[in-house]
Amino acid sequence: MRPGSWRVITHYGFTGPIQRLQAPLRRSLARAAALSTRSYATIPSAPSSQPTSQESSPAASASASASAPATKPRPTYFKDTTLASLDDFIANQSSAAPLAPSEAYTLRTAQVGPAGKKRTITRLPEWLKTPIPSAGANPEFAKIKADLRGLNLHTVCEEARCPNIGECWGGSNKAAATATIMLMGDTCTRGCRFCSVKTSRKPPPLDPHEPENTAEALARWGLGYVVLTSVDRDDLADGGARHFAETIRRIKQKKPTLLVEALTGDFMGDLDMVKIVADSGLDVYAHNVETVENLTPYVRDRRATFRQSLKVLEHVKNVRGKEGIITKTSIMLGLGETEEELWDALRELRKVDVDVVTFGQYMRPTKRHLAVEKYITPDEFELWRQRALDMGFLYCASGPLVRSSYKAGEAFIENVLKKRASERVVSEALGQAVAAEEATSAKSA
């Protein structure tokens, strides 16, 4: 091809050298070639053998040609076939039998990838699909998000890509809305193979204003129950335990009636750091074992072990007493665990008096993370919920979209905490009354 010349080549078969044509003219030529070779889905009706009076009239022909559009309308291709009409659907709706679980929970597959390299993937089950949250559709969602940005706070809801963010942030009222604040930044020193939080050996330093900003945000929202969590900070001497405890104390100072749940790491097994957080005034101490013991080395960071997590949960009870605090943990299903391994994990948790356990479906955040071995059906989640309750757990939230800080369990836990608090008040009042009566009797004698 000579320098300075152009060649238009289209998939319609039109080729030819064109000398320095402008883009609009090249597009016009390509459009003309397309219209001359395009096949339409709709087939025009055969022309009538008998011409009408309008066809025989030159004036009518001129008028029709003047009013005709310059380009042909874009055709519509119908590839799907309708199985039943609307009338048939309405008539059979009342008599239609419900789907069997095997039919309702059938997983769909799809072929993806370029031609010749296609692979089969499993579609996300229908029971795991949630609507995309919108700040415009829910003012409470927008308010919480704006407050977080203004105070430079992070949430595990966003960092871990939680599917419940629209439901928890968009509660119908302030008491229903929940956000799990993630302390000590958004960068973790560990690299668990299921988690999408950023990792680094040297995260940014702690924000000294974070405890006050967190307390201010929570007081502004007017919540009754809040969950605090954090990234692991193995780069700090105390693992961030004092920062965590200071945040809880600030919250309790601003709003003593606010119930606080702290979801902490294992502090590298340092039980003194666990005690610092447990003694800070929180109401629920949560620490997740994440999976069964046999899968822990493959799922969690190698610095975390199943037995180390059990020691953390056990030590909290030793510090605060069995009735003085609620302990909580969470297990992901769908990572390849067996039924017997799950039974063993629950038995070990009961041995250290864990009160609450939650089960949720593991969902792969990105292709770099562990693949999902199995999608657990809602019926299976319900089965494990009942099994956990039968084993003596105080409460169990179990479902495909349940997460460790899922708000569904918080209402129950909140009621338990309030009931225990009222019982303590009654017990103390009764003790004081008995002591006063004994003192009066002693004086009389």
From Swiss-Prot:
Gene Ontology CC: one annotated term: mitochondrion
UniProt: [4Fe-4S] cluster 1 binding residues: C157, C162, C168, S405
Residues of the Radical SAM core domain: 171-394
Major subcellular site: mitochondrion
GO molecular function list: 4 iron, 4 sulfur cluster binding; lipoate synthase activity; metal ion binding
Highest taxon, organism lineage: Eukaryota
Cofactor(s) needed by this chain: [4Fe-4S] cluster
A Pfam family that the UniProt record links to this protein: Radical_SAM
Binding site for [4Fe-4S] cluster 2: C188, C192, C195
Cellular compartments annotated: Mitochondrion
Transit peptide, from-to: 1-40
EC number: 2.8.1.8
Similarity remark: Belongs to the radical SAM superfamily. Lipoyl synthase family.
NCBIfam families: lipA, PRK05481.1, PRK12928.1
Protein name according to UniProt: Lipoyl synthase, mitochondrial
Annotated organism of origin: Sordaria macrospora (strain ATCC MYA-333 / DSM 997 / K(L3346) / K-hell)
